[in-house]
Amino acid sequence: MEQQRKLFQQRGYSEDLLPKTQSQRTWKTFNYFTLWMGSVHNVPNYVMVGGFFILGLSTFSIMLAIILSAFFIAAVMVLNGAAGSKYGVPFAMILRASYGVRGALFPGLLRGGIAAIMWFGLQCYAGSLACLILIGKIWPGFLTLGGDFTLLGLSLPGLITFLIFWLVNVGIGFGGGKVLNKFTAILNPCIYIVFGGMAIWAISLVGIGPIFDYIPSGIQKAENGGFLFLVVINAVVAVWAAPAVSASDFTQNAHSFREQALGQTLGLVVAYILFAVAGVCIIAGASIHYGADTWNVLDIVQRWDSLFASFFAVLVILMTTISTNATGNIIPAGYQIAAIAPTKLTYKNGVLIASIISLLICPWKLMENQDSIYLFLDIIGGMLGPVIGVMMAHYFVVMRGQINLDELYTAPGDYKYYDNGFNLTAFSVTLVAVILSLGGKFIHFMEPLSRVSWFVGVIVAFAAYALLKKRTTAEKTGEQKTIG
């Protein structure tokens, strides 16, 4: 391993992109158990639970669908992170195995560039709004600071809270996995206290019976419950399309495959059991108690009389936003941008570039057209499902769990593998799978497929790529020399 690392360094690769040595792989089961809790318990996910009630499904059906989703998520996170835990290599380099040295840049930029940076900015802005609530409860005069002053549409209090929250997120990004580990270890028990406590509060207010009988006003019980049950599972799993595709950014630190597999599985299942119970109890209970559909946990917290309870709850919600932003956005963006110019950029350079771009796009302006921006990001997310399918088919079916690292860490300008550095089979399969999974957003008769787009994209891409690559034994590169 040391000889390989020295060779790759001579080719110009930065330390951040090199395969981790065994001594550098320090993450154990507990680290992975705590990793994703904040990404499960965040404001958008709780709002999503409210949307599930609109489908007309029962409370129990929604809870069961959410819990079952955890097993699909865990399976994909573990399996797509297998190469990372085996070889200690980040996503940006693993992607080269299936798409080619040059071809990997396109799906990599979709995930680590466009989607991650835009979501990072949007999450920073959303978090700053919660921060504004928090400061406003302690210091009401802060909300009128600066009078009518605005900068690019932001008031002075809004600008201050955004920059503070942005800087905290950037700091976590610079710290990488080591800082994130310490942060999530503190966050996890706080999540149990806040969201578990909110669930108990909701049950004590209205009782468990009314919660299980809750249906939003004007909504009829669903007739095609089986398909809608699958739609709920797809919606929950699809949220993880981006983190799952770049799972190796975290599994590269694993002490062993078993540690990351056990830790992620237990962590995600436990997190989603709590989320399923707390989510439906909080949303249904609050809606019944206040006499109106109330699906945003921040709106619920704002109604509380206790300043301490509100302060602590909003603080934890802010922490979950930071955790989500780190695991899902800024850390993958840092690695991916570094991979664009591996001889010139480091991970921290990537974090800095991504952070600055997230400021320049003015996320508060993007939020003025929420429907358009979320549709755009949803389409990008829909493209990542097929990428997962291709990556897993290549690693497990075509290469049978083996990767030739020397062919991933090629010298600059060396594109002898695949067609000038592009795996055209991977791109063709990805395109077909994307059309099938997202076509329903634009073509009416394909609409049912788009409602289960993540499953369609992953399954079609996995099956098609595995079949095509198995049959194509005499490609230009030849299967014996295929990257991976």
Predicted region positions:
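C-terminal membrane-solvent junction of multi-pass transporters and transport-like membrane proteins
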Residues: 19, 23, 387-464, 471, ...
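Hydrophobic, membrane-embedded alpha-helices of multi-pass small-molecule transporters
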Residues: 27-46, 161-168, 199-206, 217-280, ...
